[in-house]
Design a protein with these regions (language model features):
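Flexible hinge/capping segments at coil-to-helix
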Residues: 25-26, 91-130
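Secondary-structure junction motif
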Residues: 118-146, 154, 205-209, 213
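Alpha-helical "hinge/linker" immediately C-terminal to small N-terminal DNA-binding modules
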Residues: 1-23
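Hydrophobic hinge/microswitch elements
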Residues: 67-72, 76-80, 86, 132-185
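Beta-alpha-beta core module
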Residues: 91-98, 102, 156-204
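Short amphipathic alpha-helical coupling segments at ligand-binding clamshell hinges
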Residues: 2-6, 44, 48, 138, ...
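Central regulatory/effector-binding core of bacterial HTH transcription factors
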Residues: 19, 29-91, 151
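Short helix-loop capping/hinge motifs at secondary-structure junctions, enriched
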Residues: 110-118, 190-191, 202-208
Length: 214
C-alpha cells in the first residue's frame, strides 16, 4: 500500500468522527466549536467537516487552530467543544479518544530514491519540526542534534523544504497538502503518530455521540 493510499484509508476510517459531528449537528440549535492543530486545519479537518456541514443546514460551526497546550486550555475554559491533536492528553477532565494512526513521512526536494532509513538522513540539512509530539516520535528512532533551522509548525517545515532549504519529517496530511508527490517519501522502519479527539469528561454529548466516545 502506498503512502497516498494509506492517507486515503485514514479519511475513510474516520466515520466515527463524522458520526459524532453529525449527531451534534442534529440539534436544531446546533453549534459546534472545533479546535485543531494548525497543520490539521490546513489539511485533514476541511476534508472531514465539508460533507456533514453541507448536509446540515442548521449547523453553526466555528473552527480554530492552536497548539495542543492552548487547545487543552480552551477545553478547560469551555471555549471549544472538541479538539483534534496529534498526541494524547492526560490532564484533569480531558478525555482522549484515539481516532487513527497517521504515518510520518520524509520530505526533501532533492531526494528521489524511494523509502528513507531514518539513520541515513543528513543531519546538516535537517530542519527541526519543533518541540511537540512529532519530534517526540522522531526521537524514539533517532536523536537529531541542534540544527540551524528550527520551526514551530509542521506546515512551516514543508514550506522550507519546498524552497530547497533542507529536509524534515512531517505527517502525511501536511506533506500532501503542501508538497509535490516526488518530495514525499516513506520512512523505514515506519513511524506513526496518533490522531486524537479531545473533549471534557464533564460535558454531556448526545446519546449517539456518547456511545461513540465510550
Amino acid at each position: 500500500i502506498t503512502l497516498f493510499e494509506k492517507a486515503q484509508s485514514i479519511y475513510q476510517d474516520l466515520d466515527n468522527l463524522r458520526l459524532l459531528a453529525d449527531n451534534l449537528a442534529r440539534d436544531p440549535r446546533a453549534k459546534i466549536t472545533l479546535g485543531c492543530l494548525p497543520s490539521l486545519g490546513l489539511s485533514l479537518v476541511p476534508e472531514l467537516v465539508t460533507d456533514f456541514y453541507q448536509q446540515n443546514s442548521n449547523l453553526v460551526m466555528t473552527l480554530t487552530t492552536e497548539h495542543t497546550e492552548t487547545l487543552v486550555r480552551k477545553l478547560d475554559l469551555r471555549e471549544i467543544d472538541l479538539a483534534l491533536t496529534l498526541q494524547p492528553v492526560q490532564q484533569g477532565e480531558i478525555l482522549t479518544t484515539l481516532i487513527a494512526e497517521v504515518p510520518l513521512v520524509y520530505i526533501d526536494r532533492h531526494y528521489r530514491r524511494g523509502a528513507v532509513d531514518i539513520g541515513q538522513i543528513d543531519q546538516q540539512r535537517w530542519i527541526s519540526p519543533g518541540p511537540h509530539s512529532l519530534s517526540a516520535a522522531i526521537a524514539t528512532r533517532r536523536d537529531f542534534s541542534t540544527t540551524r533551522l528550527n520551526v514551530q509548525t509542521y506546515y512551516m517545515a514543508t514550506e522550507f523544504v519546498k524552497r530547497g532549504m533542507g529536509c524534515s519529517i512531517t505527517d502525511i496530511f501536511s506533506a500532501q497538502h503542501n508538497l509535490a508527490p516526488e518530495m514525499i517519501h516513506p520512512i523505514t522502519p515506519p513511524i506513526a503518530i496518533n490522531l486524537c479527539l479531545l473533549r471534557r469528561a464533564d460535558v454531556s454529548l448526545s446519546p449517539m455521540a456518547q456511545k461513540f466516545v465510550d
